[in-house]
Amino acid sequence: MNKIKTKCPAKINLYLKVLNKRVDGYHNLETSFQLIDLADDMSFEVCDKDVSIASNKDFLCNTENTVFKSAQKIKSLFKVNDGVKIHINKRIPIGAGLGGGSSNAASTIVALNSLWKLNLSIAELINIGKEIGADVPFFIYGKNSLAKGIGEKLKDTDSIKDNILLIKPNIHNSTKKMFDELDLYRENDNFKTLSLIHI
């Protein structure tokens, strides 16, 4: 097998409770992740040596995005000689809190585990994913989940039964910037609990 195609679903958080900021810069939190039908498409094809990215969105074709970082991390960790050509058909809006970049990274990690015949377990893939981003473990796990820690401690939860109307205003919000601006103490201090979203 030299080529894989995947769907990368978006997610919503039914609630997000930010507990405190850790000394490593991440935040401890509690949340409920739900996968939704909106998805990007990706394809992966083994090639000689290098990692390359093509996309219907030019801003993704660089070495700073989560897909490239994920591929390079796996290639370096496991000393893989092969390269990979990656194509991203982006549908999930960026800056919307829908997890598109994390979903793409998770698909990359899972696909390369198969293409490069690494035979890593889900737990091992999740450990790699959490170094890329806090939401990546959830997308690797691939099930609706309650999450704790930075988002890597996952427990199955039921799917919601109601239909969802998703509205994306023409505003870009950086998740990192929003977390950086929270007024929270670090975990070694007394800390406040702040709920960003509670439905």
Predicted regions span which residues?
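N-terminal beta-alpha supersecondary unit
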Residues: 2-81
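ATP-dependent small-molecule kinase catalytic core of the GHMP/sugar-kinase superfamily
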Residues: 2-31, 118-196
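Short pre-catalytic strand/loop immediately N-terminal to key active-site residues, enriched for Gly-Thr
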Residues: 30, 84-96
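Short, surface-exposed charged micro-motifs
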Residues: 41-43, 85, 137
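Residues within alpha-helical segments
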Residues: 71-72, 109, 130, 138
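Phosphate-handling active-site elements
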Residues: 76-85, 111-132
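DPxDG-like acidic metal-binding loop motif
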Residues: 96-125, 138
